[in-house]
């Protein structure tokens, strides 16, 4: 996935880019408008929804910490960036041979630019298993 995005970014000529997963077909136009609004003042933003489940951090099969639920969100796409910023982050990750779980993580690793949270939508699910289609 990361290589595909990096290759796509080579062709982008716009100042800002929206990076979206094809596995999330239920994106609402209101979410796109909210992201576009955020880009008026930010160079990086993404859709996120609060976690409704308790999350545990685990090492070697043992729970080491339980973050406060208020601090845990689930990332969605699209994730939006100033094109030069995300392109630079992808280039650095390729040089370092690091794989991120999403594009926003690259911005966390390779810049000081804050990533703005934009409230997502529960309907914007990622379809990964057959049960997701029900």
Predicted features by range, described:
Residues 9-11, 38-39, 65-66, 98-99, ...:
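Solvent-exposed alpha-helices and their adjacent loops that cap or buttress functional pockets
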Residues 73-134:
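Conserved alpha/beta core of the MobA/IspD/sugar-nucleotide pyrophosphorylase nucleotidyltransferase superfamily
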Residues 1-62, 76:
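Conserved beta-loop-beta/alpha segment of the NTase-like Rossmann-fold superfamily
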Residues 59, 67, 90:
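Short, flexible helix/strand-to-coil boundary loops that buttress conserved ligand/catalytic motifs
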Residues 33-34, 63, 95, 116:
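Residues in and immediately flanking transmembrane alpha helices
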Residues 51, 68-69, 121:
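A generic structural signal for well-ordered coil/turn residues at beta-strand boundaries
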Residues 65-75:
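A recurrent flexible, glycine/aromatic-enriched loop bordering the glycosyltransferase active site
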